[in-house]
Amino acid sequence: MIKQRTLKQATKVTGIGLHSGKKVTLTLRPAPANTGIVYARTDLEPAVYFPASAESIRDTQLCTCMINDDGVRISTVEHLNAAMASLGLDNLIVEVDAPEIPIMDGSASPFIYLLLDAGIEEQDAPKKFIRIRETVRVEEGDKWAEMKPYSKGLKLDFTIDFSHPMISKDVRNFKMELSAENFIHKISRARTFTFMKDVEYLQSIGLALGGSLDNAIVLDEYRILNEEGLRYKDELVKHKMLDSIGDLFMCGYNILGDFSAYKSGHGLNNKLLRAILANENAWEFVTFEDKEQAPEGYRIGEQVFI
């Protein structure tokens, strides 16, 4: 049986909030089987809890942001979400003492190390997957995102299209099948990116105060401003794929399907997830009693994190 997964022990890290520029402490705690992924604002009294759901995402302008009916928010959840999805985690309490997850280095890599350092253990309950049964597609202008049936895992195909001398056509597309190994080795270190003109505007209105060359790739009109350059030649499209993995995991379950996107972002990713879940014929819950019949990425994942 493919079993649910949680952490062996609690772990914490302190970093900077991308928008506030202030110190943020993130604590990850194990949770019982069938709890799901639950975010919590522990700086509030009483603490405010946000179970992972597509509907909790109510702001996607600059990141993926959970907001409840009282206006309480937790921003920038997508990179941590992507790390949890890649490791097949099912049950976790994510505590944060600020309105945002720390940005760390702008990638998912620090979260991967944090989770692996805590250790991952199986629980005595079957892991539920969402398996796609019908194709669902959403569009906004020339941008689109689509999910088709595919039972062997989560297949990903992402294309970006920026007019910039540093973004040539051969680094605008990336394809990958999600597994812990593929995620860790191929895209986990891909950092968020932005343009200098956007940074200047955001900081002028009190946003992105924690943004710097230490946690983002910054481009001007002609070049990349980071002295160390890129971590991968196609780092930008890989980060957009990383974002989409995190955005799709807001349902709280690993998805079995074939995802493809052109110029998609947080908003369109969330729109796709909502459209899938709203169509009861488009998906179903499945479990796997026989490990040999399970998606390969979840059969061999233990080798990565034990």
From Swiss-Prot:
User: What GO cellular-component annotations does this UniProt entry give?
Assistant: membrane
Q: In which pathway does it act?
A: Glycolipid biosynthesis; lipid IV(A) biosynthesis; lipid IV(A) from (3R)-3-hydroxytetradecanoyl-[acyl-carrier-protein] and UDP-N-acetyl-alpha-D-glucosamine: step 2/6
What Pfam families has UniProt attached to this entry? LpxC (PF03331)
> Which cofactor names does the annotation list?
Zn(2+)
Give the positions the UniProt entry annotates as the active site.
266
Q: What are the GO MF terms of this UniProt record?
A: metal ion binding; UDP-3-O-acyl-N-acetylglucosamine deacetylase activity
Q: Does the keyword DNA-binding apply?
A: no
- Residues annotated to bind Zn(2+): 79, 239, 243
- Which UniProt keyword terms apply here? Hydrolase, Lipid A biosynthesis, Lipid biosynthesis, Lipid metabolism, Metal-binding, Zinc
Its UniProt entry gives the catalysed reaction(s) as: a UDP-3-O-[(3R)-3-hydroxyacyl]-N-acetyl-alpha-D-glucosamine + H2O = a UDP-3-O-[(3R)-3-hydroxyacyl]-alpha-D-glucosamine + acetate
> What domain of life does the UniProt record list for this protein's source?
Bacteria
Any one Gene Ontology biological process term? lipid A biosynthetic process
| NCBIfam families assigned | lpxC
Sorted alphabetically, which HAMAP family does this protein's record hold?
LpxC
Q: Which PANTHER family match?
A: UDP-3-O-ACYL-N-ACETYLGLUCOSAMINE DEACETYLASE 1, MITOCHONDRIAL-RELATED (PTHR33694:SF1)
Protein name (Swiss-Prot/TrEMBL)? UDP-3-O-acyl-N-acetylglucosamine deacetylase
Which species is the source of this protein?
Actinobacillus pleuropneumoniae serotype 5b (strain L20)
Q: What is the lineage of its organism?
A: Bacteria, Pseudomonadati, Pseudomonadota, Gammaproteobacteria, Pasteurellales
